[in-house]
Regions:
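A fold-level detector for beta-propeller and closely related beta-sheet-rich head/sensor domains
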Residues: 1-200
């Protein structure tokens, strides 16, 4: 069943500078959409604690149901070998916070992906995910090397730049409600620049 918020979009693709690998974020959560008949009452979003009811004839009364009708991972990060035409590896990107609170990790986030990727020649992939973290992976095998908590949701692809001989990773984090009352992380918001510690 297709969804209207993916598979791959929002700057969710990056290429390794030299080895022919492309990394793609995919969102795998289905959406049920229909039109209302004239005079028909718009239903609340069943399954969502917010019970949001909006005006209009466009209705997504199946979106927001949890757990979804598919198994995790809900969001994936996939490495494609363009020379061989094969998948090198695929992992769940981030965590669904409702499941992570129960000790279930690696599911990929079930929230809409609005982040992006950067791949470096030194073998790293930086990915912003809907779980409000920056994830750092080994580009060779998809092993997670680090995760950096943010104080808000990311929107748009991260950037990388150099200033005075030092390399920086720039991401955005915007305060927004958490889906379905999931736990809030504490972390920075706004434009956030990361860099490795300077050597003495």
């Amino acid at each position: 069943m297709p969804g209207n918020q993916g598979g791959a979009n929002w700057g969710s693709t990056a290429a390794h500078p030299t080895d022919g690998t492309v990394y793609v974020i995919g969102f795998n959560v289905p959406t049920l959409i229909r039109l209302l008949k004239p005079g028909e009452t718009r239903p609340a979003r069943a399954g969502s604690p917010a019970q949001v009811v909006q005006e209009g004839r466009y209705v997504t009364d199946g979106f927001g149901l949890f757990p979804t009708i598919i198994s995790p991972p809900y969001t994936t990060l996939t490495a494609y070998d363009l020379d061989a035409g094969t998948i090198k590896w695929q992992i769940g990107l981030g965590d669904d916070l409702r499941l992570a609170g129960k000790g279930i990790r690696g599911t990929g986030s079930a929230a809409t992906v609005k982040g992006g990727l950067i791949s470096t020649a030194t073998g790293l992939v930086f990915a912003t995910a809907a779980d409000r973290k920056v994830h750092v992976y080994d580009s060779a095998n998809g092993k997670q090397l680090a995760e950096l908590p943010l104080g808000g949701a990311t929107s748009g692809a991260p950037s990388m730049y150099e200033h005075e001989g030092r390399q920086y990773l720039l991401v955005t984090a915007v305060e927004a409600p958490w889906p379905d009352g999931a736990a809030v992380h504490t972390g920075p918001t706004g434009l956030i620049a990361y860099a490795l510690p300077q050597r003495p």
